[in-house]
Protein backbone atom coordinates (compact mmCIF):
# COMPACT_ATOMS: atom_id res chain seq x y z
CA UNK A 1 0.00 0.00 0.00
CA UNK A 2 1.47 3.30 -1.07
CA UNK A 3 1.15 6.54 0.87
CA UNK A 4 -0.02 9.73 -0.81
CA UNK A 5 2.64 12.42 -1.27
CA UNK A 6 1.94 15.80 0.36
CA UNK A 7 0.75 18.52 -2.01
CA UNK A 8 3.33 20.76 -3.60
CA UNK A 9 6.61 20.19 -5.42
CA UNK A 10 8.85 17.58 -3.87
CA UNK A 11 11.90 18.95 -2.04
CA UNK A 12 15.15 17.11 -1.84
CA UNK A 13 17.27 17.45 1.27
CA UNK A 14 20.73 18.66 0.29
CA UNK A 15 23.25 18.67 3.10
CA UNK A 16 24.95 21.99 3.66
CA UNK A 17 28.67 22.40 3.09
CA UNK A 18 30.81 21.31 5.99
CA UNK A 19 34.31 22.54 6.75
CA UNK A 20 36.90 19.76 6.94
CA UNK A 21 38.96 19.69 10.10
CA UNK A 22 42.22 21.55 9.91
CA UNK A 23 45.20 19.21 9.51
CA UNK A 24 47.30 21.41 11.78
CA UNK A 25 46.58 23.97 14.50
CA UNK A 26 46.31 27.60 13.49
CA UNK A 27 47.90 29.88 16.09
CA UNK A 28 46.75 33.46 16.40
CA UNK A 29 48.25 35.82 13.86
CA UNK A 30 51.17 37.79 15.20
CA UNK A 31 51.89 35.33 18.01
CA UNK A 32 55.64 35.62 17.49
CA UNK A 33 55.86 39.38 17.94
CA UNK A 34 53.48 39.28 20.90
CA UNK A 35 55.74 36.70 22.49
CA UNK A 36 58.72 38.93 21.73
CA UNK A 37 57.06 42.04 23.17
CA UNK A 38 55.86 40.34 26.36
CA UNK A 39 59.21 38.63 26.79
CA UNK A 40 61.09 41.91 26.41
CA UNK A 41 58.86 43.52 29.03
CA UNK A 42 59.41 40.63 31.44
CA UNK A 43 63.16 40.67 30.84
CA UNK A 44 63.35 44.43 31.40
CA UNK A 45 61.31 44.10 34.61
CA UNK A 46 63.50 41.26 35.88
CA UNK A 47 66.68 43.17 35.00
CA UNK A 48 65.45 46.30 36.78
CA UNK A 49 64.45 44.45 39.94
CA UNK A 50 67.70 42.46 39.96
CA UNK A 51 69.80 45.59 39.49
CA UNK A 52 67.92 47.46 42.20
CA UNK A 53 67.83 44.70 44.82
CA UNK A 54 71.02 42.76 43.91
CA UNK A 55 68.99 39.59 44.48
CA UNK A 56 71.04 36.71 43.08
CA UNK A 57 68.03 34.37 43.11
CA UNK A 58 66.73 36.23 40.04
CA UNK A 59 69.85 35.59 37.98
CA UNK A 60 68.65 32.24 36.49
CA UNK A 61 65.39 33.88 35.41
CA UNK A 62 67.25 36.80 33.86
CA UNK A 63 69.71 34.54 32.03
CA UNK A 64 67.06 32.17 30.66
CA UNK A 65 64.71 34.96 29.57
CA UNK A 66 67.45 36.86 27.80
CA UNK A 67 68.94 33.78 26.14
CA UNK A 68 65.75 32.13 24.89
CA UNK A 69 63.61 35.16 24.01
CA UNK A 70 64.91 35.96 20.51
CA UNK A 71 65.40 32.31 19.43
CA UNK A 72 61.90 31.31 20.55
CA UNK A 73 60.34 34.32 18.81
CA UNK A 74 62.02 33.52 15.50
CA UNK A 75 61.11 29.83 15.69
CA UNK A 76 57.49 30.87 16.27
CA UNK A 77 57.69 33.12 13.22
CA UNK A 78 59.05 30.28 11.08
CA UNK A 79 56.34 27.93 12.37
CA UNK A 80 53.52 30.40 11.69
CA UNK A 81 54.69 31.38 8.23
CA UNK A 82 56.10 28.19 6.74
CA UNK A 83 56.05 25.21 9.09
CA UNK A 84 52.56 24.53 10.45
CA UNK A 85 52.26 21.31 8.45
CA UNK A 86 55.49 20.02 10.01
CA UNK A 87 53.91 19.86 13.45
CA UNK A 88 54.62 21.58 16.75
CA UNK A 89 56.19 18.48 18.30
CA UNK A 90 58.80 18.12 15.54
CA UNK A 91 59.80 21.80 15.54
CA UNK A 92 59.91 21.89 19.35
CA UNK A 93 61.93 18.68 19.43
CA UNK A 94 64.44 20.11 16.95
CA UNK A 95 64.71 23.28 19.02
CA UNK A 96 65.24 21.61 22.41
CA UNK A 97 66.71 18.18 21.72
CA UNK A 98 68.57 19.12 18.57
CA UNK A 99 69.98 22.27 20.13
CA UNK A 100 71.10 20.40 23.24
CA UNK A 101 72.76 17.60 21.27
CA UNK A 102 74.50 20.16 19.07
CA UNK A 103 75.92 22.11 22.02
CA UNK A 104 77.06 18.99 23.89
CA UNK A 105 78.57 17.37 20.81
CA UNK A 106 80.39 20.52 19.73
CA UNK A 107 81.76 21.15 23.24
CA UNK A 108 83.09 17.60 23.60
CA UNK A 109 84.72 17.66 20.17
CA UNK A 110 86.24 21.13 20.42
CA UNK A 111 87.77 20.33 23.80
CA UNK A 112 89.85 17.49 22.33
CA UNK A 113 90.57 18.76 18.82
CA UNK A 114 91.05 22.52 19.00
CA UNK A 115 94.10 24.38 20.26
CA UNK A 116 94.87 28.13 20.16
CA UNK A 117 95.99 28.90 16.60
CA UNK A 118 95.01 30.84 13.51
CA UNK A 119 92.94 27.89 12.31
CA UNK A 120 90.97 27.61 15.54
CA UNK A 121 88.00 29.59 14.20
CA UNK A 122 87.78 27.47 11.05
CA UNK A 123 87.94 24.31 13.15
CA UNK A 124 85.25 25.59 15.50
CA UNK A 125 83.00 26.44 12.55
CA UNK A 126 83.42 23.01 10.97
CA UNK A 127 82.83 21.18 14.26
CA UNK A 128 79.80 23.17 15.41
CA UNK A 129 78.06 23.06 12.03
CA UNK A 130 78.69 19.31 11.78
CA UNK A 131 77.33 18.80 15.31
CA UNK A 132 74.13 20.70 14.52
CA UNK A 133 73.69 18.81 11.25
CA UNK A 134 74.15 15.49 13.06
CA UNK A 135 71.56 16.58 15.64
CA UNK A 136 69.09 17.33 12.82
CA UNK A 137 69.71 13.89 11.29
CA UNK A 138 69.07 12.27 14.67
CA UNK A 139 65.80 14.14 15.10
CA UNK A 140 64.52 13.20 11.63
CA UNK A 141 65.56 9.56 11.35
CA UNK A 142 62.07 8.49 12.50
CA UNK A 143 60.34 10.86 10.07
CA UNK A 144 61.20 9.45 6.63
CA UNK A 145 58.52 11.47 4.85
CA UNK A 146 59.95 14.83 5.91
CA UNK A 147 62.02 16.06 2.99
CA UNK A 148 62.48 19.05 0.74
CA UNK A 149 64.32 22.36 1.12
CA UNK A 150 61.42 24.15 2.84
CA UNK A 151 61.28 21.60 5.65
CA UNK A 152 65.06 21.74 5.88
CA UNK A 153 65.06 25.51 6.22
CA UNK A 154 62.47 25.51 9.02
CA UNK A 155 63.78 22.52 10.97
CA UNK A 156 67.42 23.48 10.47
CA UNK A 157 66.69 26.95 11.77
CA UNK A 158 64.95 25.39 14.79
CA UNK A 159 68.06 23.36 15.64
CA UNK A 160 70.27 26.40 15.09
CA UNK A 161 68.19 28.67 17.29
CA UNK A 162 68.09 26.02 20.02
CA UNK A 163 71.88 25.85 19.83
CA UNK A 164 72.11 29.65 19.96
CA UNK A 165 69.81 29.89 23.00
CA UNK A 166 71.83 27.40 25.04
CA UNK A 167 75.14 28.90 23.92
CA UNK A 168 73.94 32.40 24.87
CA UNK A 169 72.94 31.12 28.31
CA UNK A 170 76.46 29.77 28.78
CA UNK A 171 78.09 33.03 27.71
CA UNK A 172 75.77 35.01 29.97
CA UNK A 173 76.63 32.80 32.93
CA UNK A 174 80.37 33.17 32.26
CA UNK A 175 80.00 36.95 32.00
CA UNK A 176 78.16 37.05 35.33
CA UNK A 177 80.83 35.28 37.37
CA UNK A 178 84.06 37.27 37.87
CA UNK A 179 86.88 37.42 40.40
CA UNK A 180 85.14 40.36 42.06
CA UNK A 181 81.85 38.45 42.42
CA UNK A 182 78.65 38.88 40.42
CA UNK A 183 79.05 41.28 37.48
CA UNK A 184 75.47 42.21 36.61
CA UNK A 185 76.48 44.88 34.11
CA UNK A 186 78.52 42.38 32.08
CA UNK A 187 75.55 39.99 32.12
CA UNK A 188 73.15 42.61 30.75
CA UNK A 189 75.61 43.74 28.08
CA UNK A 190 76.20 40.15 26.96
CA UNK A 191 72.49 39.34 26.74
CA UNK A 192 71.63 42.51 24.84
CA UNK A 193 74.46 42.03 22.33
CA UNK A 194 73.78 38.34 21.73
CA UNK A 195 70.03 38.93 21.59
CA UNK A 196 70.49 41.45 18.77
CA UNK A 197 72.90 39.19 16.85
CA UNK A 198 70.99 35.91 17.36
CA UNK A 199 68.82 36.11 14.18
CA UNK A 200 71.89 36.37 11.95
CA UNK A 201 74.01 33.50 13.28
CA UNK A 202 73.34 29.86 14.07
CA UNK A 203 69.72 29.92 12.91
CA UNK A 204 70.67 31.07 9.40
CA UNK A 205 73.64 28.75 9.07
CA UNK A 206 71.83 25.57 10.12
CA UNK A 207 68.84 26.52 7.94
CA UNK A 208 71.16 26.42 4.92
CA UNK A 209 72.66 23.02 5.76
CA UNK A 210 69.23 21.66 6.69
CA UNK A 211 67.80 22.72 3.33
CA UNK A 212 70.64 21.01 1.48
CA UNK A 213 70.32 17.87 3.61
CA UNK A 214 66.56 17.39 3.12
CA UNK A 215 66.68 18.39 -0.54
CA UNK A 216 69.03 15.43 -1.13
CA UNK A 217 67.15 12.97 1.11
CA UNK A 218 66.24 9.69 -0.57
CA UNK A 219 62.57 8.68 -1.03
CA UNK A 220 63.05 5.88 1.50
CA UNK A 221 64.08 8.44 4.13
CA UNK A 222 67.80 7.74 4.15
CA UNK A 223 70.24 10.61 4.20
CA UNK A 224 73.15 10.77 1.80
CA UNK A 225 76.26 12.96 2.01
CA UNK A 226 75.82 14.40 -1.48
CA UNK A 227 78.07 17.15 -2.80
CA UNK A 228 75.46 19.93 -2.20
CA UNK A 229 75.32 18.94 1.49
CA UNK A 230 79.11 18.98 1.85
CA UNK A 231 79.33 22.30 -0.01
CA UNK A 232 76.66 23.87 2.20
CA UNK A 233 78.39 22.60 5.34
CA UNK A 234 81.75 24.00 4.22
CA UNK A 235 80.17 27.30 3.19
CA UNK A 236 78.36 27.94 6.45
CA UNK A 237 81.44 26.83 8.41
CA UNK A 238 83.36 29.56 6.58
CA UNK A 239 80.67 32.13 7.46
CA UNK A 240 80.81 30.90 11.05
CA UNK A 241 84.61 31.27 11.14
CA UNK A 242 84.46 34.78 9.67
CA UNK A 243 81.78 35.75 12.20
CA UNK A 244 83.88 34.54 15.14
CA UNK A 245 87.12 36.06 13.86
CA UNK A 246 85.74 39.52 13.05
CA UNK A 247 87.34 40.96 16.19
CA UNK A 248 90.80 39.67 15.28
CA UNK A 249 90.47 40.67 11.62
CA UNK A 250 89.50 44.20 12.67
CA UNK A 251 92.58 44.42 14.94
CA UNK A 252 94.84 43.25 12.11
CA UNK A 253 93.36 45.74 9.62
CA UNK A 254 93.73 48.65 12.03
CA UNK A 255 97.34 47.69 12.71
CA UNK A 256 98.10 47.44 9.00
CA UNK A 257 96.55 50.82 8.25
CA UNK A 258 97.64 52.95 11.19
CA UNK A 259 100.32 51.29 13.32
CA UNK A 260 103.93 52.33 12.85
CA UNK A 261 106.48 50.91 15.22
CA UNK A 262 103.80 49.06 17.19
CA UNK A 263 104.75 45.92 19.10
CA UNK A 264 102.33 43.44 17.52
CA UNK A 265 103.11 40.74 20.05
CA UNK A 266 100.73 42.60 22.35
CA UNK A 267 97.82 41.56 20.12
CA UNK A 268 97.58 38.41 22.21
CA UNK A 269 95.79 40.62 24.73
CA UNK A 270 92.92 41.00 22.25
CA UNK A 271 93.05 44.78 21.95
CA UNK A 272 95.17 47.56 20.50
CA UNK A 273 97.68 48.77 23.10
CA UNK A 274 97.96 52.55 23.43
CA UNK A 275 95.25 53.02 20.82
CA UNK A 276 94.38 56.44 19.46
CA UNK A 277 90.92 57.83 18.73
CA UNK A 278 91.43 57.10 15.04
CA UNK A 279 92.33 53.49 15.76
CA UNK A 280 89.33 53.00 18.03
CA UNK A 281 86.96 54.41 15.41
CA UNK A 282 88.47 52.22 12.70
CA UNK A 283 88.27 49.16 14.93
CA UNK A 284 84.56 49.78 15.58
CA UNK A 285 83.95 50.33 11.87
CA UNK A 286 85.72 47.13 10.82
CA UNK A 287 84.18 45.02 13.60
CA UNK A 288 80.59 46.10 12.97
CA UNK A 289 81.07 46.17 9.21
CA UNK A 290 82.43 42.62 9.22
CA UNK A 291 79.46 41.31 11.18
CA UNK A 292 77.05 43.11 8.84
CA UNK A 293 78.71 41.62 5.74
CA UNK A 294 78.61 38.08 7.14
CA UNK A 295 74.97 38.53 8.19
CA UNK A 296 73.99 39.83 4.74
CA UNK A 297 75.72 36.88 3.09
CA UNK A 298 73.76 34.44 5.25
CA UNK A 299 70.45 36.21 4.63
CA UNK A 300 71.05 36.26 0.86
CA UNK A 301 71.87 32.54 0.89
CA UNK A 302 68.69 31.65 2.77
CA UNK A 303 66.55 33.85 0.51
CA UNK A 304 67.99 32.23 -2.61
CA UNK A 305 67.16 28.77 -1.23
CA UNK A 306 63.64 29.91 -0.33
CA UNK A 307 63.00 31.25 -3.84
CA UNK A 308 64.12 27.99 -5.44
CA UNK A 309 61.91 25.85 -3.19
CA UNK A 310 58.57 25.33 -5.04
CA UNK A 311 56.69 24.36 -1.87
CA UNK A 312 57.73 27.58 -0.11
CA UNK A 313 55.20 29.72 -1.96
CA UNK A 314 52.37 27.26 -1.28
CA UNK A 315 52.74 27.19 2.49
CA UNK A 316 49.81 28.59 4.47
Identify the meaning behind each predicted range.
Residues 1-316:
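Hydrophobic alpha-helical segments at protein termini of multi-pass membrane proteins
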Amino acid sequence: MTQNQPPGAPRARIPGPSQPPLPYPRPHAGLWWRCLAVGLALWALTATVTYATRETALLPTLILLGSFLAPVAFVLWAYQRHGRDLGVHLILGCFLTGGTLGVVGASMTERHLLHPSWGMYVGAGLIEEAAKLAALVFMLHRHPRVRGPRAGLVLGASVGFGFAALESAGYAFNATVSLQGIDLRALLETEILRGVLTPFGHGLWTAVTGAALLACRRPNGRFRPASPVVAAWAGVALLHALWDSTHGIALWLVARLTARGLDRTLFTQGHLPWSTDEQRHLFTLFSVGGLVLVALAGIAWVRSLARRAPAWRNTP
